Amino acid sequence: MDVAPERLARWLENFAGRHGPWTADGLLLTAEDGATAELAPPPGSPGTEDLDELRRAAGESRRIGLLLARKGAVAVGVADGPKLVVSKVDTHYVQGRTAAGGWSQQRFARRRDNQAKAAAADGAGIAARLLLPEVRTLSALVTGGDHTAVDTILAAVPLQPLAALRSDRFLEVPEPRKTVLEDAIAQARAVRILVKDPT
């Protein structure tokens, strides 16, 4: 589950209310009834194994880059804290699969592949225009959508400084649109918590 940094203190209170008092061993909380909660810092925050440090760092405002991509669409933005300050969304037509067989199927597959490559090249261009000028101010690059599309975009040589900032957190998002990009900010800023109830 993802918890907004400003709601973390309340979540910890509720965890204690549901499972009893807890003790912390680094970022692993163990409650009286045996339930555990493992916390992961948000992308771009300093790595820590201390709960109080995590609470402080998670609440700090950070600039993060966002790159959401699927085969025919890309959304790129910069968030300063919870606010989207720069963004660009672009779509490309990429033909779907066809039921035709033989030469037609191969021709359509080549066309689809060429359309996907053109969309990725345009996505890399947008990422370069929006994110490269900001690269020194970004604490992380959070990606999402389709792994192959994102990896293809970030494989562009000029984007290597961005690839170095890429967070392990990968967001599951639908077709990238501006509203999807705005919603992704909350996921990118959140403290990720894995709760295991007692058996």
Over which residues does each language-model region extend?
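Terminal alpha-helical anchor/extension segments at protein ends
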Residues: M1-T199
